[in-house]
A protein has these predicted regions:
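C-terminal peripheral helix-coil segments that are non-catalytic and often amphipathic
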Residues: 2, 133, 137, 168-186
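Hydrophobic/aromatic residues within well-ordered alpha-helical segments
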Residues: 15, 65, 69, 86, ...
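A secondary-structure capping/hinge motif
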Residues: 59-61, 111
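Hydrophobic alpha-helical connector segments
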Residues: 71-108
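Amphipathic C-terminal alpha-helical segment
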Residues: 122-123, 152-170, 181-186
């Protein structure tokens, strides 16, 4: 029974990846607005109905790692080693994200399309909320605590600044050193 579940989950992951890869290739090649979801489904050899079982919208095809990114942010806080601060754990996580930053071509695609920019903004707001909730839980603060929300917002905003810098690792170290000196838990 376990093998069947494993195979089924593996097949679902392969289908999801095939859809996301086909979509990105077509969007980069021809432009987001010029590609329909039927073309993406055909390129991945699935039906449009199947496409929408995996992705709720055309925009979601571009952000196929949305849930993974959020889960990793929360895990960075909850799964940090004993004795490591939340800020230090987030610094390490943001550095890992920076090292696997999206390509310039991908970023241009997002910036060129209002629907994708809006989706990305809403996605990062969801991640910010989840991260703030995780920080609050770890700090013993009530959900919605403004300092936890501010830390989450600052950390996620810093990601963009770090990726845009010519020396991302150095930029991250400087930003998080400032944060570490200034942000204290009470």
């Amino acid at each position: 029974m376990t093998e069947v579940i494993g195979r089924r989950e593996r097949k679902k992951a392969q289908t999801r990846k095939a859809l996301a890869d086909a979509a990105l290739e077509l969007f980069l090649e021809r432009g987001y607005e010029k590609v329909g979801v039927k073309e993406v489904a055909d390129a991945a050899d699935v039906s449009v109905t199947t496409l929408f079982k995996y992705f709720p919208s055309k925009e979601a095809l571009v952000f196929d790692r949305d849930e993974d990114i959020e889960a990793a942010l929360v895990l960075a806080v909850h799964g940090r080693p004993p004795g490591h601060s939340v800020v230090d754990a987030l610094r390490k996580h943001i550095l890992r994200l920076t090292e696997s930053a999206p390509s310039d071509e991908f970023l241009r695609l997002i910036e060129s399309e209002p629907a994708l920019r809006d989706y990305a903004r809403r996605m990062w707001m969801r991640h910010e909320t989840a991260l703030a909730r995780a920080i609050a839980k770890e700090m013993g603060a009530p959900e919605g605590d403004v300092t936890c929300a501010a830390l989450a917002r600052f950390v996620l905003a810093s990601r963009e600044l770090i990726q845009a810098d010519k020396h991302p690792r150095r930029a991250a170290e400087k930003i998080f050193a400032c944060l570490q000196r200034g942000w204290r838990t009470e």
